């Protein structure tokens, strides 16, 4: 039995060695790309410094409105910061359980509304093409993991769904999901158990054009490479969304106490070739 285990482990060990050698190479390639082309910052943490800067770069709610696939309805505006607010360059989203009947979500699967929460989306869209072939999207988060909490940092199509790329998504546990949806059934998922997700961690995607139709999306947590997913996202504009849904895929019943989700050091940048 020991011999069999050793034989089985050998390919794994060689694979680990190969992966370890690839990771520095990826970082070097990305640095080389940045050096070779013009690098532009699209959004940075100055947009979390005050509401004037924030509202110049971000919209309140989802791009399509207040509802999505969970039991939270999003609230927020330039005059309503009960569920989305800024302090010391940190964005906080607060989900609060409601005690009255507010009907059901207008989005599939039309769950009963049990919470008020918050969502934001970028005014500028990510588009991978010949002019902007490389993008970096990253942010630091403190996330809740209580059953029923569903924080996310993700990209989704402006004109259709999919495309979708989930850079950070927790569903009521300490497991982060990094997903790429090419169709509703063609999905790549990389799951990582994060130690103390309620502490600050950095979630990052590097998106690079690799053909006339396809991109590679490299996913990272705290600077550690986790996976690369390939998808036909070239030329498809994407929103960047930060939100906290509740219940749904994250389980029920959700919390009765207020639930908090913090973000800082948001960064979106790209290379320009012309």
Regions found by a protein language model. Give the residues of each.
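GH16 jelly-roll
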Residues: 24-274
């Amino acid at each position: 039995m020991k011999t069999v285990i050793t034989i089985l482990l050998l390919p794994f060990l060689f694979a680990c060695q190969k992966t370890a050698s690839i990771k520095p190479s990826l970082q070097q390639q990305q640095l080389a790309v940045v050096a070779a082309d013009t690098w532009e910052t699209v959004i940075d943490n100055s947009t979390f410094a005050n509401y004037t800067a924030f509202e110049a770069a971000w919209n309140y709610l989802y791009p399509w409105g207040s509802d999505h696939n969970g039991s939270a309805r999003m609230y927020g505006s330039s005059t309503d910061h009960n569920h989305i607010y800024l302090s010391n360059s940190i964005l906080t989203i607060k989900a609060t359980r409601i005690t009255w009947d507010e009907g059901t979500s207008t989005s599939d699967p039309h769950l009963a509304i049990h919470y008020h929460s918050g969502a934001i989306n970028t005014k500028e869209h990510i588009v991978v093409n010949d002019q902007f072939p490389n993008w970096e999207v990253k942010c630091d988060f403190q996330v809740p993991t209580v059953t029923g909490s569903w924080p996310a940092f993700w990209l989704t199509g402006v004109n259709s769904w999919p495309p979708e790329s989930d850079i950070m998504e927790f569903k009521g546990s300490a497991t982060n999901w990094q997903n790429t949806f090419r169709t509703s059934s063609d999905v790549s998922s990389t799951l990582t158990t994060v130690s103390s997700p309620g502490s600050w961690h950095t979630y990052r995607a590097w998106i690079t054009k690799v053909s006339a139709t396809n991109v590679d999306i490299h996913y990272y947590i705290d600077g550690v490479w986790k996976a690369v997913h390939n998808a036909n996202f070239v030329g498809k504009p994407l929103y960047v969304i930060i939100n906290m849904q509740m219940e749904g895929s994250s389980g029920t019943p959700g919390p009765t106490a207020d639930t908090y989700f913090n973000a800082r050091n948001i960064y979106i940048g790209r290379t320009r070739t012309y």
